[in-house]
Swiss-Prot record:
Taxon lineage: Bacteria, Pseudomonadati, Pseudomonadota, Gammaproteobacteria, Alteromonadales
Protein's recorded name: Acyl carrier protein
Main function: Carrier of the growing fatty acid chain in fatty acid biosynthesis.
SUPFAM superfamilies to which the protein is assigned, alphabetical: ACP-like
Transcription regulation found in the keyword field: no
PTMs per UniProt: 4'-phosphopantetheine is transferred from CoA to a specific serine of apo-ACP by AcpS. This modification is essential for activity because fatty acids are bound in thioester linkage to the sulfhydryl of the prosthetic group.
Pfam families: PP-binding (PF00550)
Gene responsible for this protein: acpP
Subcellular compartments: Cytoplasm
Length: 77
């Protein structure tokens, strides 16, 4: 597991209050991890802070799964 993947998963666990073993690459924040729209906004903000990047709204809307978050951060580091 890459450092980025570990950090993204840690943020998801902290922000959504889910178990680490539930944070699988294909897991949807809303459908599988029980996030609501506010949770997803806060999650994006936490990712921006952790990785010192800015995620535009149109990109943030596409980040709906754990793998999508990992991929976005990996490409935009």
């Amino acid at each position: 597991m890459s450092n980025i993947e570990e950090r993204v998963k840690k943020i998801i666990v902290e922000q959504l209050g889910v178990k680490e073993e539930d944070v699988k690459p294909a897991a949807s924040f809303v459908d599988d991890l029980g996030a609501d729209s506010l949770d997803t906004v806060e999650l994006v903000m936490a990712l921006e802070e952790e990785f010192d990047t800015e995620i535009p709204d149109e990109e943030a809307e596409k980040i709906t799964t754990v793998q999508a978050a990992i991929d976005y951060v990996s490409k935009n580091q």
